[in-house]
């Protein structure tokens, strides 16, 4: 289903919002896994599936979002950041967000999201650079601490841990879903079970 800025533009005026530079699509975990299995063989020439772990063989981190990229496009110049990510992020793309189930208990829901934030913070150690200026002081301090810890954990392991955390409740019945591969400041967004299962 359409999501985020793409959904806003579609509902508001039937087009793109001016400040958005990509397309956003959300899947339940089950549908996402099916999509990534068939997409490589079904995407047209010039488009490809880019998983986060495909960049530099999973040794670096940008985020946990899988994308469909349009290879015949360039968005940025040949910058140091683009070279760090092998030029794979220098394209027009479709973000593929994953909806996973959250435990119904307040403590279980909090713990799932908290652990995702910890893994994301540790993964930031494997980015091309860290810009703490965009965070408030407490968040900047915690991000710095986590990124120092992340220096001692291989990024490939963090990718596996994040995937396990995201899907650990997928077989359980629950009333809420969340965006498990989105950035931490949006983990507060949850969706009702009926909305996800009826729409997707």
Question: Model-flagged regions — what are they?
Answer:
Residues 1-23, 27, 32, 36:
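Active-site nucleotide-donor binding segment shared across nucleotidyl transfer reactions
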Residues 116-118:
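C-terminal helical/coil "lid" or tail adjacent to the Rossmann-like core of SAM-dependent
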Residues 106-112:
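A short secondary-structure junction signal
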Residues 1, 39-104, 120-200:
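Conserved catalytic core of two-metal-ion nucleotidyltransferases
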